[in-house]
Amino acid sequence: MYAAHPIKPLKAPKLKTKFLRRVFVGASIRRWNDQACPLEFVELDKQAHKAMIAYLLAKDSKDRGKDLDLDLLIKYFCFEFLERLVLTDIKPPIFYALQQTHSQELASYVAQSLQDEISAYFSLEELKEYLSHRPQILETQILESAHFYASKWEFDIIYHFNPNMYGVKEIKDKIDKQLHNNEHLFEGLFGEKEDLKKLVSMFGQLRFQKRWSQTPRVPQTSVLGHTLCVAIMGYLLSFDLKACKNMRINHFLGGLFHDLPEILTRDIITPIKQSVAGLDNCIKEIEKKEMQNKVYSFVSLGVQEDLKYFTENEFKNRYKDKSHKIIFTKDAEELFMLYNSDEYLGVCGELLKVCDHLSAFLEAQISLSHGISSNDLIKGAQNLLELRSQTELLDLDLGKLFRDFK
């Protein structure tokens, strides 16, 4: 916890509680609800899976020498995710048809609905322009491909469950056709590389691990959905902290991948980690070995380097020197004062830890507000509020985000 510089008064984050509640609505939006699903798919999980796939496609494109702006990719991903949250009641076939005839009206409605929530971070005019006239550039092609690949991953489960149900074959053919149209983006990545397909499937399986699994809760967010919440919070709060472009990107990706090792060891609950002496360090060592055997062996050296940077010591403040060696700073103030420029590829682990706690706090508080309660949820929310209600980072009053949800 860091006190503000005495000369500067504390600033309130521009992140709105209304916006955070909207993001969590994504965990209640059922997907494929007109199909016989063997399990429940929700929008928040699909969007997180889409973001992970988009990262792999973007990294592969950059490795093949293509010019690509990751910050723009993340911003456009956020635009598409928010559009889906606002227009949740429109079924995809109708939505795509309306986009052909009423794209400007739909875009204006989305922007108007989000005006009070995101105008401090994004230009509403840029949002409207993007949603009504998506530019035909590599970033949007990657997002489209990631969207269809994540949808295919879900629908393959439905298809194998009941391939003869009405309309199922037509949906499968349409998704396969869309992926075929963008297969040039999968060159050297998916194609015949079964190992990478397994990795993407492994990412998707994080949706099966539920958070707070020992207590009833609504909505029942997954580890996968939680990672996207942390990523978006970290990305947006980077603007409040005036983080450089690469640090902002790293906060999104660091949030997105911070729980990836948990699919290999399962989500061992924090009280057990903290109560058994030496257990947490032992788990970390096991996670490293499992990541090497089951993740890093499937990906390029560049992706390996990124994932290690985002999953090992994920909540420590760090940057990379000229030789790409990871250096840890003594605190966030040192990181921002000396290494807040793109060349250092900095990560404020403290910020991501606060976002991780904020996501957990909201999971508990939102369930309690729905009337779904348990001692674990009540105690968990109280403990997080006590821990974080006065948290400050540089001159930013992050505790306000917790106090506003009391």
Region locations from a protein language model:
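Alpha-helical, largely C-terminal catalytic domains
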Residues: 1-406
